[in-house]
Amino acid sequence: MWHNISPRTASFPLAGDVMAIQVTLLSHSDDPLRSLYMAYRTCYSQLTPQQVAKRIGDDRITREEMTQFIEERLKTGHASPLEQVSYEFGISGVSRAFSHQFVRHRVGISFEQQSQRYVTYKEGEFPYTVPETVRKAGMQDRMDELFDRVGELYEEMVAAGIPAEDARFLLPNATNTNFKITVNFQSLLHICDLRLCTRAQWEFRKVAALMRSEVMKVTPELGRYLQPKCGEHRLGYCDESEKDWAACPIGRVRPHKEVLFRIYEAYRKGETQPLREQDWDVIEEKDLVILGD
């Protein structure tokens, strides 16, 4: 059963582009927290799903209890119940460079994308994204001029009877496109694990952040789990290369897995000692990631 809601939108304007990135939550599973709790509880209870639903309806199970139970289950890695909760998004103003990455997510997500075969750009004017780095380098004017010429040639081709499916070969990766997607919560978690990471391409990070923002508005109990994989509600540590971890702006507060292994090995060998009171005089608090006890 789907819960239809008034469309709500999160957007991210980009300097110099024709369209802003917009992400709108169109609908979602009816009461995602309840649905997810029932899915998990069915696996770990003698009660039938109908009996669990009645207990929730009778207020014998609170939302706080449901949230706590789900959190405990998530820590075990039991993921299949997450597939029973789905979100439906409208995404617009994104580039084809983004879309080629987006559609690589294939499990638990379905896409419908604006076609360049059936949609013809009027007067050769196609919306496109200008990266901030291009604008800061003072090269946006040259990019605009080039795309103006592309648009003119595109229009001439269509006017000459060349099908849009062939004229589109001219169009650049910067060309904007639109999506309507349906994604289950397990897949959305995986997307955010990877695409909220600072190593992900900036446009994908923006889209993932806007999707998270939309989910937080309707189910904050679940939205808080939409983090990069190093987040406190996910792995809690970085498993990328140590070089990438060292360059990450949040690397100071998120340990790398190899660092954890080295700390454990030192502890196992008895090479560590608890933090002493006098140690605070020589170690700045901001540099402390893991403390002895």
Predicted features, each with a name:
Residues 2-293:
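Family-specific signature for flavin-dependent thymidylate synthase
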